Amino acid sequence: MSAQDYYGNSASKQSYSRPSAPPPGYETASRGYAPSQSQQNYYPPQQQQQQYQQQPQYYQQQQPQYYQQHPQQPIYVQQQPASSGNEDCLAGCLAGLCLCCTLDMLF
């Protein structure tokens, strides 16, 4: 399948044109602002300056708490099982048995 078969002929594409007017019933108050207030006058300049000065203090206070909230990962340590002292003897017996069986098969 070619790209032209998949997407179709470029001549059959429809072009989009922007509408010339807003839909009926559209008002400026629907944007979230009151019609009498503008976005620039919503906050007084003094409050914006105070908020800007308070932000570094807020982050400085929160940083130690942020790092303390994460619990530490547990450390897993593999421990050897308690030995009764006869593992060396069992390994020696097994090696001797293997040696005897091998010599028995050869001779």
From Swiss-Prot:
Disulfide bonds: none annotated. It is found in: Cell membrane. Residues 1-18 have a biased composition (Polar residues). The modification N-acetylserine is found at S2. One of its GO terms (cellular component) is plasma membrane. It comes from the Eukaryota. Keywords: Acetylation, Cell membrane, Isopeptide bond, Lipoprotein, Membrane, Ubl conjugation. Residues 35-81 have a biased composition (Low complexity). There is a cross-link at K13 (Glycyl lysine isopeptide (Lys-Gly) (interchain with G-Cter in ubiquitin)). It is a lipid-anchor. Residues 1-86 are annotated as: Disordered. It holds the Pfam family CYSTM. PANTHER family: CYSTEINE-RICH AND TRANSMEMBRANE DOMAIN-CONTAINING PROTEIN 1 (PTHR47564:SF1). Present with 2250 molecules/cell in log phase SD medium. Belongs to the CYSTM1 family. This is Lipid-anchored protein YDL012C. It comes from Saccharomyces cerevisiae (strain ATCC 204508 / S288c) (Baker's yeast).
